[in-house]
């Protein structure tokens, strides 16, 4: 691609589209510092160093509490009450209270375990102060407000409905009714137990998801996004409808390492959509092609969306098993997108981009070989050595930062600017640490709120009652049950992010599908059911 277009790609990718773009001065420095500390905490937690040095080891629940605490604090430091307003002093106070509610679990974890779910009440003279009831209730309310700011109202409404169902269960329709949880039991289960807010979903976020998001952030800041786009244009840019196919291919390659539809769209769409419009695609079709290809990045191995990691923990299989089963559907989906874009180009009579305006394939491929090394490291550790996803992504992330450092040192020999290159590497690394944490705010908050729903289902016996309800509606008709699941996914998907949508529907419907399928003479593998819900 010629120099001006090449520069345009880099400018679009470098454009600050993050939630922190309105922050300035001391406020920005504080947010950046907290984000970097969060990233270092996650790197330490995922590394083998705590076991090697017998220092800094964190148990499951305290680690999850710290993880959510960082997410809540950053959410209130970055996202104001109303989108167009600014963060004020009250927002900062709420953020500090939120992380304090989480850190209470870290500092008093042993006491919580010893009391076996009984909430502590402080005796002060003739007064009894339910300290932990206040802390837990405050934490839940702050989590819901953070979700409203970061994700939106729909997920909050659903979570509140499940909380009300937990408390007022005796007033629900008879077929799903239950005795109702006391406020102490409700708060204790939701905030201080490992089956709800701090359950499996956020545990997966702590163990795997953060580092995969961090890996994608490092790769993007090092120039990986531009490399994959250039490579996509070099491969298919000259074909009929080339920009659309390049958008699909670029989004697919970016999706292999980002696992985020939003990050994918931002990285590739800011450049590919204008190019598609210039070559003849309508703005609606250009946007649709980019969104479809970017969203499909969540199902593209080796780094799928956050829901895939939650799925592995729900089912009790390795992440590699999920990747293995998801690979073929992902390839088929991108082949279908290629075919559709080709038909659109034929219908519109479009041609490809002129060859002299495209990057040369060999030069482009060789220029970014160092970006492929960490990806191969990740695949090798996951697939061949069968290391845990946590260790695999940790070593892949370290290899990415190290390879980028070596690349900067080697290239400095050509331009004799070692100091400048090392400064660039340092800046890319720091920005990667910041972006990784900031990109995780929405994921962490959404997963924690989805945990409210999981906790409500588990504590009220709703899943068992729901099987009876669904069976009475479907009457052992698997097709009707599948259609009900599809409709539920679509309705929730209009307002929920992918991971939250998956957690909610999987909690409600996955075992129902398996049980009704068995009763009807069909054997549905549990992994197939969960992938169906995910897709």
Place the predicted regions along the sequence by residue.
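Conserved, well-structured core domains of diverse proteins
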Residues: 1-127, 133-137
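Long, contiguous bundles of hydrophobic transmembrane helices that form the permeation core
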Residues: 2-28, 35-36, 324-439
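Membrane-interfacial loop-to-helix junctions in multi-pass transporters
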Residues: 129-134, 195-208, 235-247, 279-285, ...
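Flexible hinge motifs at transmembrane-helix junctions and intramembrane kinks/re-entrant loops
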Residues: 144-179, 200-201, 222, 226, ...
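Core transmembrane alpha-helical segments of multi-pass membrane transporters/permeases
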Residues: 145, 150, 160-175, 183-187, ...
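Hydrophobic transmembrane alpha-helices that form the pore/transport pathway of multi-pass ion
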Residues: 229-297, 307, 316, 499-535
